[in-house]
Amino acid sequence: MKRFFIGCIRLYQKFISPLTPPTCRFYPTCSHYGIEAIQRFGVLKGGWLTIKRISKCHPFHRGGIDPVPEKKQEK
């Protein structure tokens, strides 16, 4: 399942993203954030983090550096 969603993001990066001017207000970009979040947390939590991140990527948000959170260590 992870591979499918990461593959969708990579298809977007390769074929759709080059057709539009760069507009992401964050570092790393939202698509890179999505890949890293899904790799680190899985499809559900990583997907949720990605949706939250994309919802903040608009002209009224100042953007900036917003890395994927670290995974909490289990005790």
Curated annotation (Swiss-Prot):
GO terms for cellular component: plasma membrane. It is a peripheral membrane protein. Disulfide bonds: none annotated. Coiled coil: none annotated. SMART domains: Haemolytic (SM01234). InterPro entries: Membr_insert_effic_factor_YidD. Could be involved in insertion of integral membrane proteins into the membrane. This is Putative membrane protein insertion efficiency factor.
